[in-house]
Amino acid sequence: MNKPIIALDFQTYEEVETFLANFSGESLSVKVGMELFYSNGPIIVEKIKQQNHAIFLDLKLHDIPNTVKSAMISLAKLGVDMVNVHAAGGKKMMEFAREGLEIGAGSGKRPKLIAVTQLTSTSEAAMQTEQIVKASLLESVLHYSDLTKQAGLDGVVCSALEAEEIRLQNGEDFLRVTPGIRLLSDAANDQIRVVTPEKARVIGSTNIVVGRSITRANDPVKAYNQVLKEWNV
C-alpha cells in the first residue's frame, strides 16, 4: 500500500513521541522538516528510525555544489529514505547532491533524491513579480522538472495540479511528491495550491505529504485512515 507521508511539524521530540504513540506498532512514512531537525539535530532521525518509520528529510538544500555534496554525504549516513534540494540551485548542484548521497550511502541503498520546483505557497503572480520569472507557473515547474531529470534525480516536489503534466513530460517512474494535501473539511492555511488526497491520486501524484489534517486532528488515527482510504481507492 502507498502510504501518505505524515509531516511531523513539531518542535520537540516529546511532541513527536506523543503523536506517534497513537500509531503504536505501525510503520509509517513521515517527513522531518526544518523546524524539527534544527530544533533537535540528527538525533531526532535516529529516534524515529528506531520505531521503524520511513523518513523523508525535508531540508531543501540550496547552496554551491560542493557544499551541498558534503552535506548530502552526512545526511545519507543518517539512514533516511528520501531527501531534497531546490531545483533552482541548478543542474550541477543537483548532480553533486546525488553524488554526495551515493558516497554517503556506501554499499547501502542511497536515499531517494527529489527537487523542489515551486513552493505550494507560491502563486503565479508572486513568482512573476518577486522572482522576475516571465513564464507561467506551469512552465516554470516543467522546466525545473526537466532539469531535475537531466541531473539524474528521482523526481520532484510539486503541486498535484502540475503532476499529470510532469508525468507526461518525464515519465511514469519519475516521482511526483505532493505537499499541500488537505481533507475536504480542512482549511488551506498558508498554502495556495492545495488538493484532497483523492484528487491528488486522480491527477497524477505518486506520493502525498499530509500535515495538519492528521497531526492537528482530534483523532489522528481516524484522520490518517481517512487520508489512506482516499489515497488508495
UniProtKB/Swiss-Prot annotation:
Q: What is its EC number?
A: 4.1.1.23
Q: Which of UniProt's keywords are assigned here?
A: Decarboxylase, Lyase, Pyrimidine biosynthesis
Entry's Gene Ontology cellular component terms? cytosol
Enumerate the Gene Ontology biological process terms. 'de novo' pyrimidine nucleobase biosynthetic process; 'de novo' UMP biosynthetic process
Q: Is the keyword Lyase in the record?
A: yes
Q: How does it assemble?
A: Homodimer.
Indicate what this protein is called per its UniProt record.
Answer: Orotidine 5'-phosphate decarboxylase
Instruction: Tell me the name of the encoding gene.
Output: pyrF
